[in-house]
Amino acid sequence: MKDFLEDYKKSVSERGSEGIPPLPLNAKQVQAVVEILTKDPTNAAFAKELLIHRVSPGVDEGAKVKAEFLAKLSQKKLECVHISALEATTLLGTMLGGYNVEPLIMGLESQDKNIAKESAKALKTTLLVYGSFDKIAAMSKTNALAKEVLESWANAEWFLNKEPLNECIEACVFKIDGETNTDDLSPASDAFTRSDIPLHAKAMLKNRIENYEQRIKAIKTKGVPVAYVGDVVGTGSSRKSATNSIMWHFGKDIPFVPNKRSGGIVIGGVIAPIFFATCEDSGALPIVADVKDLKEGDLIKIYPYKGEITLNDKVVSTFKLEPETLLDEVRASGRIPLIIGRGLTNKARKFLGLGESEAFKKPSAPKSDAKGYTLAQKIVGHACGVKGILPGTYCEPKVTTVGSQDTTGAMTRDEVKELASLKFDAPFVLQSFCHTAAYPKPSDVSLHATLPGFITQRGGVALHPGDGVIHTWLNRMGLPDTLGTGGDSHTRFPLGISFPAGSGLVAFAAVTGTMPLNMPESVLVRFKGEMNPGITLRDLVNAIPYYAIKKGLLTVEKKGKINVFNGRILEIEGLPDIKMEQAFELSDASAERSAAACVVRLNKEPMIEYLKSNIKLIDEMIASGYEDKETLKKRRDAMQAWVDNPVLLEPDSNAQYAAVIEIDVAEITEPILACPNDPDDVATLSEVLADTTGKRPHAIDEVFIGSCMTNIGHFRAFGEIVKNAPPSQARLWVVPPSKMDEQELINEGYYAIFGAAGARTEVPGCSLCMGNQARVRDNAVVFSTSTRNFDNRMGRGAKVYLGSAELGAACALLGRIPTKEEYMNLVSEKLESQKDKIYRYMNFNLMENFRL
């Protein structure tokens, strides 16, 4: 006990010097607190405060110890002079759900009427009861308090007893001009601290603005709530840590939940869809409104019901809150609590024979004259058990596949615990370790050791560090025409559809097997024509924003930004026979368009080929000891069932789209690349070389071939171009996306070629793409095959081009961006005659002696 007190007070002092609270108590520490309460009266008052306020709720390991102790006190099996049986019952009611539910149900039958009543009172506000609902329902036939609990749930007292949003909210503006991406709010270099919300929040905006700590501190002294304001807010990764950081600085404490806050206000001219949804989930108020007349330090009034923002009693901006349920979401402390609570209310009403509740705002049916459905609308409809879902419709589709990666996995674990879940209802949940495998910090090593068991115990599947990028694996676990999600913005399945999300919603989807969705509109991109020699799929990826800019549907400028893709589904057709790995290049890059999701219309044949390969992969995973075996077997069987009867959904010919962009690939006669530092700022090779402003530098310092945007064909092509050439003029990084790609490239001799070229190779994984481990040199000019090129992402001050591996090879050879002629000559000489050999994909079922 003495050691615990000394260690804890030391931790309080150390973290206090950084302006942050101590970490929540772990199970061992909670056990020490319990011992102090029962054996050390001198420190009991301090220990009681820790037990009440410093233990995470739900099914956290510490919560189990806390609940067991309080249950013994409530049931009078143990006495503690500092906590009465009645107070213990009250404290059980603060733990949200999980380990506290069973003791509270038992309390309904207590001989002590006060404890029985207090148990009922606690259960009325406990939403995370899951299977225990049936137990309470059965009890209600003979137990008046159990019936009272059901009636309270049915009447939505848990919701109606919360204060609605005020008619007028006074706030002080904290404004970041231009675009704030999630890497600004949650720097990748600090990814290892993300689950420690207060510590991670200290890094918010450190790479974006000078004197960031002073600015944040100063704005909080105004004595009113702070509104985070920007022209474009939340683009980029799906990391919930970005939202967590804003809420830690500007939100409100959550009673009895340590080191976490909710609430907060975000106002943006454009708010990226994943970030917007994460704000909804977390109880924040996201508002899309013109912000040009708002300046830092302005004391504004926000009228959420009228949709006005005033400054000095003058209206400076107007808005309409969307979705319609947003006010309910804020009142319920978030969209996820609202969905869970609303479901509990409906379940109780159904059991009691009551009609639908009138307590909640009902989403209006969309007004549409649409006669048909797009492919995306049909896939979502299929997940909802209907023919299709029109834009504007609120729905809760079934989630078939869920992904979690390591830099968000610890947060997802915490969210699963808070949801009081011991089992996943989603059919397939995959956890990877791709962002931290190469250079793990001590916290990463701990995560690698503890997170796999947490996932597999709940029926999920855990990969190993070094296996490779999550998307390379998760794509192979998908099923045609099904819906999924994942805690990474590049969760963009090439078959079916996926809506990436923050870790809170990912946890919800994994736990419940469903996710909330306000169905977006779709933008159709239709390719036609024949590709010219030397043109790659990556050029088609960059052609999408290139042609959108031509049509006035996309602007690079952030102020008053136009982006037709933002928050919509990108639907792609016209390339029906490309391989699944190629289709993923297209769907993956929809993240950089800020699209909500993407679907690629393909024929059956590439899907059948892909699934046959994936069935073999799963067989080898089972043979190699990957867990959970039953989950893997079920997914393998589902794949085989589809291969045996391959039927695909098709869009209706009269489906309606928000916009249609037609791209004749025959018009593309040279590579298209994204320029520093904006994935929307695309230009042809000739346009880049014609730029003499210095904004598009021509000399290349470093080249990166890797990320989820690559497949084995890219590495072969790169190898063939640099083979037998002098060592690269640029610093060269080569990192395959999976250990299967790595082994095959070694077998084929390409690693020898990479070594001769002077390449630095790493274990399969994300490598430079996220910039959370190894980074390029400060101020380097980089050519990369990775996903995005935000400021400071790959390296401080780095200027990053995005394009194909083939163009990257030319840059590596020359140490500069080649001319169109130089590039075409290289491709023609090195690749054209052996394209079929180079661009072969990983069909494991056809590979002799394939083993993991």
UniProtKB/Swiss-Prot annotation:
User: Which free-text remark accompanies the cofactor?
Assistant: Binds 1 [4Fe-4S] cluster per subunit.
Q: Which PROSITE patterns match?
A: ACONITASE_1, ACONITASE_2
What is any one of the record's Gene Ontology cellular component terms?
cytosol
Catalyses: citrate = D-threo-isocitrate; (2S,3R)-3-hydroxybutane-1,2,3-tricarboxylate = 2-methyl-cis-aconitate + H2O
Q: What cofactors does this protein use?
A: [4Fe-4S] cluster
Per the record's keyword annotation, is Ribosomal protein included, yes or no? Answer: no
Pathway listed:
Carbohydrate metabolism; tricarboxylic acid cycle; isocitrate from oxaloacetate: step 2/2; Organic acid metabolism; propanoate degradation
The first-level EC class reads lyase
Name the keywords, alphabetized: 4Fe-4S, Iron, Iron-sulfur, Lyase, Metal-binding, RNA-binding, Tricarboxylic acid cycle
A Gene Ontology BP annotation from the UniProt entry:
tricarboxylic acid cycle
Quote the EC number. Answer: 4.2.1.3, 4.2.1.99
Cross-referenced Pfam families, in alphabetical order?
Aconitase, Aconitase_2_N, Aconitase_B_N
Q: Where does substrate bind?
A: R194, S237, S238, R239, Q405, D406, T407, S489, R788, R793
MF terms (GO), sorted A to Z: 2-methylisocitrate dehydratase activity; 4 iron, 4 sulfur cluster binding; aconitate hydratase activity; metal ion binding; mRNA 3'-UTR binding; mRNA binding
Q: Which residues bind [4Fe-4S] cluster?
A: C708, C766, C769
* Subunit (UniProt): Monomer.
User: What is the stated purpose of this protein?
Assistant: Involved in the catabolism of short chain fatty acids (SCFA) via the tricarboxylic acid (TCA)(acetyl degradation route) and probably via the 2-methylcitrate cycle I (propionate degradation route). Catalyzes the reversible isomerization of citrate to isocitrate via cis-aconitate. Catalyzes the hydration of 2-methyl-cis-aconitate to yield (2R,3S)-2-methylisocitrate. The apo form of AcnB functions as a RNA-binding regulatory protein.
Query: Per the similarity annotation, which family is this?
Result: Belongs to the aconitase/IPM isomerase family.
Give the matching NCBIfam families: acnB (TIGR00117), PRK09238.1 (NF006690)
| Designated name of the protein | Aconitate hydratase B
